[in-house]
């Protein structure tokens, strides 16, 4: 890992890539870039209240502090279902879901946004990675007594792949599942949706 260095250029070579930073050149097989999005809301009227993280504050119907003005998607923080706390989750599924809620509330506020589990999946190299609900590290910020368990699921017989490695995060007192992460060379992205359903009440 190389922190606090600005990437100046990336050059593809026969053996991988050369990453030029403000401090050095790094030869490697591949690179993974983690980018963090944040809403650019400087243009907003000052009457519209914001949260501490500068996202737009909304009520359960996604209406802002100004009547008949709603906000959706990457501009808002959403409720985290398992712990009833808000968090910023710039995901396309949250944008679509919040947009649908607002569309239903334009004439009359009748649909509440139930929150998000931040369910996501991707493929990095040969591995599929998926997550829903709380991670173990995020659990440090919440009052529940959390525990985790590692689970291994063999590959289905007709799929000649590898096992699925998973981690379940749960409330130690109530035994309620609060989060899950999966990793496998097999496509496990659909399985995270099943785990997300188990977290929802």
Regions found by a protein language model. Name each.
Residues 3-15:
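A conserved short coil-to-beta-strand element within the FAD-binding core of flavoproteins
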Residues 2, 70, 147-149:
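General small-molecule cofactor/ligand-binding pocket signal
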Residues 15-19, 143-146:
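Short, hydrophobic/aromatic-rich segments at coil-to-beta transitions
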Residues 78-186:
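Mid-to-C-terminal Rossmann-like scaffold of FAD/NAD(P)H-dependent oxidoreductases
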Residues 7, 20-25:
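A structured beta-alpha segment of the ubiquitous adenosine-cofactor-binding alpha/beta core
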Residues 25-101:
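FAD-site-proximal beta/loop scaffold in flavoenzymes
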Residues 9, 61, 167-169:
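Short, surface-exposed charged micro-motifs
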Residues 186-201:
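A short, polar/charged loop-to-alpha-helix boundary motif
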């Amino acid at each position: 890992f190389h922190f606090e260095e600005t990437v100046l250029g990336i050059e593809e070579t026969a053996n991988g890539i050369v990453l030029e930073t403000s401090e050095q050149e790094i030869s490697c097989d591949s690179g993974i870039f983690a980018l963090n999005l944040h809403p650019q809301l400087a243009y907003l009227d000052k009457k519209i209240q914001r949260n501490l993280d500068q996202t737009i504050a909304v009520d359960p119907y996604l209406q802002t502090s100004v009547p008949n003005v709603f906000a959706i998607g990457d501009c808002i923080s959403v409720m985290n279902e398992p712990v009833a706390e808000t968090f910023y989750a710039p995901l396309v599924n949250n944008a679509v879901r919040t947009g649908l809620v607002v569309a239903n509330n334009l004439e009359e506020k009748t649909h509440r946004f139930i929150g998000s589990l931040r369910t996501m999946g991707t493929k990095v190299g040969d591995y599929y990675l998926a997550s829903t609900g709380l991670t173990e590290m995020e659990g440090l910020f919440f009052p529940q007594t959390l525990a985790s368990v590692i689970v291994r699921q063999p590959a289905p017989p007709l799929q000649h792949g590898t096992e699925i490695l998973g981690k379940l995060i749960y409330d130690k007192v109530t035994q309620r599942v609060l989060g899950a992460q999966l990793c496998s060379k097999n496509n496990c992205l659909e399985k995270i949706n099943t785990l997300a359903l188990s977290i929802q009440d």
